[in-house]
From Swiss-Prot:
Keyword DNA repair: no
SUBUNIT field: NDH-1 is composed of 14 different subunits. Subunits NuoB, C, D, E, F, and G constitute the peripheral sector of the complex.
Enzyme class: translocase
GO cellular-component term (any): plasma membrane
Listed name of the protein: NADH-quinone oxidoreductase subunit D 2
């Protein structure tokens, strides 16, 4: 029997599909197993964050930022509080110790976020063991975050003018701390990460031939396309563009630290994976430098003479940082009252999700999982 024509099949992946990592719906047209068209459908997790911010005081907005990208809450807090501090200008001087604590916790948060991104992507491609290792190692970091902030994922720890409280006694540890103290001291975790976690991921997954076969030359994004689509973070650097806000436009005190920017070559799913893996090691380097400074420099963690009621002068500010998924930015408008007139949030995951119609056609339906995992979207951040 001769088949003269085939009929395309329209498939809905989600919004409850386990590989979409949230309530994301992908509408896919298939010719056999080959994808001819892909369209993301979002909005299932919209919670009116930007409108709610207009009805809250400036400090009351901080917990809402935690709930955008709930896997990297500390980075969201950092973006918002630094934006508001810009509105005040020289009236608020953040103590140096608070600045180091902010950077250290931001980089530890980057490690937790990347661990989950790598672990979940590996599991979606059939590798269960790395995902379990990911949860094992993140649990150690969450124990540290809980001791410092009282929360495991949602912290409400950073403050306009500093941080809520100083670090608990003994949490820093010593450079001699080993694996047995990985969940008790920050030095213990960093030494454990450098000695076990980082080499383990490289050997178990990155060097695995099956994993490479599933990710190399899959979802290739050129540098020109990445720039045209306003990509950032690991997605942009995976395409060979050496751009990291911590280096190129330093904020906080990142200009004081020594670290490198990992850059991919081919712009495929494997390169985006590799960049995140190497970024974890660079974050470890930054944390070590913070630990050395904090051990020798006690001091206040909140700006002196902070007003009881925060009323920044009229004005507007746009502030951006290097988040776990790319460039997180916050546009804040002040009318001189206790509440922001407007808060606009830039989500890198929202921007990167627009790549799906570009990257998916021409690949097999199984490759969509690798492409989506390499983009690393969090639906709380996409929908806000």
């Amino acid at each position: 029997m001769n088949v003269e024509r085939t009929q395309e099949l329209l498939v809905n992946m989600g919004p409850q599909h386990p590989s979409t990592h949230g309530v994301l719906r992908l509408m896919i047209k298939l010719d056999g197993e080959q994808v001819t068209w892909c369209e993301p459908d979002i909005g299932y997790l919209h919670r009116c964050f930007e409108k709610l911010a207009e009805q809250k005081t400036y400090p009351q907005v901080i917990p809402f930022t935690d709930r955008t990208d709930y896997l990297a809450a500390m980075l969201n807090e950092l973006c918002y509080v630094e934006a508001v501090e810009k509105l005040f200008g020289d009236a608020i001087q953040v103590p140096e110790r608070a600045q180091y604590i902010r950077v250290m916790l931001a980089e530890l948060q980057r490690i937790t976020s990347h661990l989950l991104a790598l672990g979940s992507m590996a599991m979606d491609l059939g590798a269960t063991t790395p995902f379990l290792y990911c949860w094992r190692d993140r649990e150690k970091l969450y124990s540290l975050f809980e001791r410092i902030t009282g929360g495991r994922m949602l912290y409400n720890y950073l403050r306009i003018g500093g941080v809520r409280n100083d670090l608990p006694e003994g949490i820093l540890g010593t450079p001699q701390d080993g694996e047995d103290k990985a969940d008790k001291t920050i030095w213990g975790f960093i030494n454990y990460f450098d000695s076990y976690v980082y080499p383990e991921w490289k050997a178990l997954v990155t060097g695995n031939r099956i994993f490479q076969y599933r990710t190399k030359n899959i979802g290739v994004l050129t540098a020109e396309q990445a720039i045209a689509y306003s990509c950032s973070g690991a997605v942009l650097r995976g395409s060979g563009v050496k751009w990291d806000l911590r280096k190129n436009l330093p904020y906080a005190i990142y200009d004081r630290f020594e670290f490198d920017i990992p850059v991919g070559q081919n712009g495929d799913s494997f390169d985006r994976w590799w960049v995140r893996q190497e970024e974890m090691y660079q974050s470890s380097r930054i944390v070590k430098q913070c630990l050395e400074w904090l051990a020798e420099n006690p001091g206040p963690v909140m700006a002196p003479k902070m007003p009881r009621v925060l009323k920044p002068p009229k004005g507007e500010v746009y502030h951006r940082i290097e988040g776990a998924r790319g460039e997180v930015a916050c546009y804040v408008v002040s009318d001189g009252s206790t509440n922001p007139y407007k808060v606009k949030w830039r989500s890198p995951a929202f921007t990167h999700l627009q790549l799906m119609p570009l990257l998916c056609p021409g690949h097999k339906i199984a490759d969509i999982i690798a492409i989506l995992g390499s983009i690393d979207v969090v639906l709380g951040e996409v929908d806000r």
